[in-house]
Amino acid sequence: MKMKDFKLERYFAQHEFTAKHLLSSSDCDGYGQDYVLDRANPTELKMWNDIKLGYTESAGNPILRESITQFYKTKNIEEVVVGSPGELNYITMRVLLEKQDHVVAVSPAYQSLHEVVHSIGCEISYWKPNENWTFNPSQLEHLVRKNTKLIIINFPHNPTGSYLTLSELNQIVSIAKKNDCYIFSDEMYHKLLAKSEKELPPISDLYSKGISLWGTSKSFGLAGLRTGWLVCNDLDFIHRVICYKDYLSICSSAPSEILSIIALNHIDDFLQPNIKKIQQNINLFAEFAQTQDVISSFIPPKSGSTAFVKLNINCSSLEFSNYLVEKAGIMTIPAEMFDHPGKFIRVGFGRESLPKILPIMRVFLEQNKQILS
């Protein structure tokens, strides 16, 4: 079965580099190469200066994998494989699933978490949130069947900013253990948390069939490195991922691996400015939302860098987004890009430009009240 076009990425391709203002980006502002290298210690700087632009190890640079393990219980680099995040998501589904397997997946979600599963010919059930964007593990349990092979979760959650408690995450692990199925946990926004939230451990720390995906794109503000990694205690699974990777990227970029090592070893210099910026932008948007009738509901995110904002409009969210980018140059991602019913747009809080965008959006909404409401 062929995969459908990636709607969200195609929408970004259409507008991301032509729109004047981006209000829906899920990543944080990208740091410059000099910023990364300025944080390198002498050993790391020597690695950079001595870099060879040949092939790298297919599983990932051993020093990079060792740097990754500082954030996990496992200290065995054989339980870590490096690749681009999208590639690793794709490979995971391909090596784990067969036609007619059953999968339970969080929804709404980044399209690739569902589409690859569909393309294999699996049956998929969706674990959906309540109106306040909370996910109930008891509802998940009712979706699991005897032939369920995989549970797909994503917390911090894109696009809603929802999060779980440790008790809720442990419930999910218990459900998976009871049914002997894998858990694939998209943790790309790991560590981006509101002050009120307690950081969850990676799923690979809690369950031998737990597969954790993280990378430098979101939390670190280093999306251009295209560095991601899987961590799993199941060495056979890791081996199959590496073997499948031989048909795709084969290996990672040597410069990206060294820059990723530096970022991981100096994580607070990347993470803390992003957390501060996200929280400031959330507060600004909350004030803005209170003054706008077109915003029906704004639930501040508990985690991650995005929120799913409900609109009070007489058109679809896609029509709203198209009109907004055409008339005001502001790009937003509508609910249709997540196959989610209702009138919502994703708002991203990881960019310094948000305070400058809101006044422009305010003028647009005031000038188009009759059209929108």
Annotated model-derived regions:
Residues I261, K277-A286, S297-L311:
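Conserved glycine-rich beta-strand-loop-beta hairpin in the small C-terminal domain of fold type I
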Residues I120, N147, K178-N179, Q292, ...:
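Helix C-cap/helix->beta junction micro-motif
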Residues V95-I153, S174:
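PLP-dependent aminotransferase-like
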Residues T74, V104, N314, Y323-T332, ...:
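PLP-dependent enzyme catalytic core of the Aspartate aminotransferase-like
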Residues E131-K198, L372:
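Active-site phosphate-binding strand-loop segment of PLP-dependent enzymes
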Residues M1-S84, N368-S373:
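N-terminal small-domain helix-loop-helix segment of the aminotransferase-like
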Residues N61-P62, N76-Q100, R226:
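Conserved beta-loop-alpha segment that forms the PLP phosphate-binding cup at the N-terminus of a helix
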Residues S208-Q279, E287-F288:
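Conserved core segment of the aminotransferase class I/II
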